[in-house]
UniProtKB/Swiss-Prot annotation:
Residues 1-72 form the S1-like domain. One of its GO terms (cellular component) is cytosol. The keyword Cytoplasm applies. Its main location: cytoplasm. CDD domains: S1_IF1. Keywords: Cytoplasm, Initiation factor, Protein biosynthesis, RNA-binding, rRNA-binding. Belongs to the IF-1 family. This is Translation initiation factor IF-1. InterPro entries: NA-bd_OB-fold, RNA-binding_domain_S1_IF1, TIF_IF1. The gene is infA. Pfam families: eIF-1a.
């Protein structure tokens, strides 16, 4: 899949789940399950409840996503 097909949405982390997954509430009021991207894990960027994040999603499964950026 090419990067042009990915959907990006801003959201807020509402809950921390096991195995580095998070429940994220998007701006359009949908709740999804998301995990951190590999570069965020590699650089040890912490994500906590209440953080504003940017989530990438595939158009094929709109219930799961990948956190690619944490806003300061």
């Amino acid at each position: 899949m090419s990067k042009e097909e990915l959907l990006e949405f801003p959201g807020v982390v509402t809950e921390l789940l096991p195995n580095a997954t998070f429940r994220v509430k998007l701006e359009n009021e949908h709740e999804i399950i998301a995990h951190t991207a590999g570069k965020m894990r590699k650089n040890r960027i912490r994500v906590l409840a209440g953080d504003k994040v940017l989530v990438e999603m595939t158009p094929y499964d709109l219930t799961k996503g990948r956190i690619t950026y944490r806003f300061k």
